[in-house]
Amino acid sequence: MAASVEHDSLESMEAPQTAVEVEETKTFKDLGVTDVLCEACDQLGWTKPTKIQIEAIPLALQGRDIIGLAETGSGKTGAFALPILNALLETPQRLFALVLTPTRELAFQISEQFEALGSSIGVQCAVIVGGIDSMSQSLALAKKPHIVIATPGRLIDHLENTKGFNLRALKYLVMDEADRILNMDFETEVDKILKVIPRDRKTFLFSATMTKKVQKLQRAALKNPVKCAVSSKYQTVEKLQQYYLFIPSKFKDTYLVYILNELAGNSFMIFCSTCNNTQRTALLLRNLGFTAIPLHGQMSQSKRLGSLNKFKAKARSILLATDVASRGLDIPHVDVVVNFDIPTHSKDYIHRVGRTARAGRSGKAITFVTQYDVELFQRIEHLIGKKLPVFPTQDDEVMMLTERVTEAQRFARMELREHGEKKKRSREDVGDNDDTEGAIGVRNKVAGGKMKKRKGR
């Protein structure tokens, strides 16, 4: 009898730092995953399990409740999807599992992974999120899918108003990005959901950080859980090269264009603090010939998914986003993250830069620091426990870009104004004219299109 795994207190299964040799020999079959799902992993290119999967999957297959703490990009979705599908194969049932997520985009992404892993066994998923017609979701729920992936608010709406829909037979509950769910003030909704699902269930809670709110939720929702932690409290991955640039705020646009030219050929994710600045900067870059596309909360759901898919398909090399896009999204080819606007909350820095250097790859993160951001930047350095180096620039070359950037700024402001007026007239969502791709005429006025790097560099 393994007494060490059976006592009542929260246990810790820290991943040993010296276990590299063991990890290299582990396969999904070694973890106890059934053959048909191992084949699905092979087809998805999952050659070997990640650290969090090695820690969590065997315990989940034993029927334990799990708290998974792992850095962004660590394979968390596979860590809960594989045990759930394994159990579904053994005891097939409709409305078998519920996955709660903080954002719509993450919900669709999790659904894609469940459907890909379960394609050979006919797994059916329903995504229940805001911004999409409730009636079509009600019809999807009436078909009783195996897996429901939902944001808490819209799920409560269906539990209260959709006739015949309930989760009384649910076997698995997953809360993914639990810290973000709670930070978005979904606590009331989560409490309501916990009251209408069976107590006799398995619960997996995954979070990048173990906040006080997450600890409180863990006590309310999990029974004798085991903790699988593969990262320190606040950690950025080892292969991430982190830099900062201290610049006057009026030159931020110019330095951004310089960096995009210097690192041309890479894919970029650029974080802005507001929807308006995301849209403005996307227009600015488009006017200069860059393949930039925005993703923010004022865009319609279809436009947000469209932007995301264009970027994932490499049809666009630059994605400008607010923090709505900074957590959980599996975009495998981001080479460089730029914090164009420094995050107000230091923890958001961890999640933003977690878009690059994922699953063993290397990447860069560059944070713009203006005269107004020094205190916020110092908090970030304190949180991650290191002083960041300056990203090298040639200031004279940056200043040579000023005239053209200024002209592009002017046209971007004009387009934003025109769009605002059109929105008032037609009451369209700001994202429905998204996306800056209609700015061809304006772009042609900005001499020369995309800037060329100077010869000899």
UniProtKB/Swiss-Prot annotation:
Chain positions covered by the region annotation Disordered: 415-457
PROSITE patterns tied to this protein: DEAD_ATP_HELICASE, HELICASE_ATP_BIND_1, HELICASE_CTER, Q_MOTIF
Residues engaged in binding ATP: A70, E71, T72, G73, S74, G75, K76, T77
Chief localisation class: nucleus
InterPro entries assigned: DDX47/Rrp3_DEADc (IPR044765), DEAD/DEAH_box_helicase_dom (IPR011545), DEAD_box_RNA_helicase (IPR050079), Helicase_ATP-bd (IPR014001), Helicase_C-like (IPR001650), P-loop_NTPase (IPR027417), RNA-helicase_DEAD-box_CS (IPR000629), RNA_helicase_DEAD_Q_motif (IPR014014)
Enzyme Commission numbers on file: 3.6.4.13
Gene Ontology molecular-function annotations: ATP binding; ATP hydrolysis activity; RNA binding; RNA helicase activity
First-level EC class: hydrolase
Residue ranges of the motif DEAD box: 176-179
Entry GO CC: nucleolus; nucleus
The keyword rRNA processing belongs to this UniProt entry's keyword annotation: yes
Subunit-level organization: Interacts with AGO1 and AGO2. Interacts with GABARAP. Interacts with NOL8; the interaction is RNA-dependent.
Protein name, entry field: Probable ATP-dependent RNA helicase DDX47
Organism name: Bos taurus
